Amino acid sequence: MSNFVRLIFDWSEVWALLIPLFAFLLGKRQHALLKPVIVYLWLALVLNLSEVIIAEFKIIYHFPAWLQSNNPIYNIHSIVRFACFSYFFISLPQSSFKWLKLGIALIFVLFSVVNFTYFDVFFNAQSFSGNLLTAEAFLLLIYCMLYYLYALNDEDDVMSKGPVFWIVTGLGMYVVINFFVYLFYVVMLAQNPTLTTNIWTVHNIAYIIFCLFITRALYATIRN
């Protein structure tokens, strides 16, 4: 892979977010249900920009010791993403599975506490928490499946035909693609760092696709 293409992918977690944010800024109004997604986009932009700046410039500009690793930011990003999309799914006007959705959110909180108490170190400079990101992807996938299950059982559900559909579909694709990336990332990092770097490109491609689906959702609100 050429240096130019590598540079594009290295910064993809930043510029990909600018696409849906641009669509958001163009719109005069957005559906209230999309507010958690908009909040996520802005927070993700700050977090991802911080991640890339640390990765690209920590050596050149001699960042202090506590800024020599961006892995803790990935842990923060995982928690932020789950919190925003958990709120998004719980807020959907779908009466079924309400308590189950709340239970999923509680499971994530309990898992995170146990994980960082007994298994992982939150501020680990060597790697982000594969356990955390894997659990996040799995639970978000359950949210997506519950959404589709409700939509299949209710043909009149307007949420299955608008911007919410595009967001859930994009999120579902993102977590399905990256579940195994997160699951085996820490092991691969220890055994073959070069392969791990190449596999992370798959994550970046999935993230670009995810952002394009969000853009499609926001564009739909602009047209309407």
Regions found by a protein language model. Give the residues of each.
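Terminal, non-globular segments
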Residues: 1-224
